[in-house]
């Protein structure tokens, strides 16, 4: 809150169990009732399904939109968010590599996916000048042996 002088217009967060996003959104909405919450979930191509049994997934992330209610956690209900962005695993990998090279930040897949979505949100003309906060929850350490950080 210090970095934004107490004002956040848009919160971008991943759909994991939903607890962090829900709690953060609840607090920020108490400060700004007009807060927009953008939930980020894996693109259908980046989910393990019978149609995609070998999909590279965004680790620790669950879809919240367009899925059976029985699969949602107690906090992962799409009604607390205003929009949803699907991110492909490859987009998360590309973002992680770009940020590592440019900024020296070593992101994991879910952090990179959230950042990828936040950049998309920030590029929209209607969001120019708005304070956008993104929650990044993982680093790249546990992904060193995965395709994400293997040498190309």
Write out the residue ranges for each language-model feature.
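Short beta-strand segments
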Residues: 13-15, 39-41, 133-138
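Generic structural signal for well-ordered alpha-helical scaffold segments
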Residues: 1-5, 25, 97, 118-123
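Short glycine/serine/threonine-rich phosphate/pyrophosphate-binding segments
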Residues: 14-25, 110-118, 143
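Phosphate-binding loop/pocket of nucleotide- and phosphate-handling active sites
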Residues: 59, 70, 74, 116-152
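Glycine-rich ThDP/TPP pyrophosphate-binding loop and its adjacent helix/strand module
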Residues: 1-36
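Short glycine/serine/threonine-biased micro-segments
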Residues: 14-17, 21, 58, 102, ...
């Amino acid at each position: 809150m210090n970095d934004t002088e107490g004002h956040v217009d848009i919160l971008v967060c991943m759909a994991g169990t939903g607890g962090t996003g829900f709690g953060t959104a609840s607090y920020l909405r108490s400060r700004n009732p007009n807060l927009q919450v953008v939930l980020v979930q894996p693109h259908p191509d980046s989910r393990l399904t019978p149609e995609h049994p070998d999909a590279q997934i965004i680790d620790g992330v669950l879809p919240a939109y367009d899925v059976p209610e029985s699969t949602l956690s107690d906090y992962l209900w799409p009604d607390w968010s205003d929009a949803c962005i699907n991110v492909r695993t490859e987009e998360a990998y590309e973002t992680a590599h770009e940020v590592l090279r440019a900024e020296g930040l070593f992101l994991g897949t879910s952090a990179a996916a959230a950042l990828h979505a936040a950049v998309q949100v920030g590029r929209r003309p209607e969001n120019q000048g708005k304070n956008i906060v993104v929650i990044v929850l993982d680093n790249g350490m546990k992904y060193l042996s995965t395709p994400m950080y293997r040498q190309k």
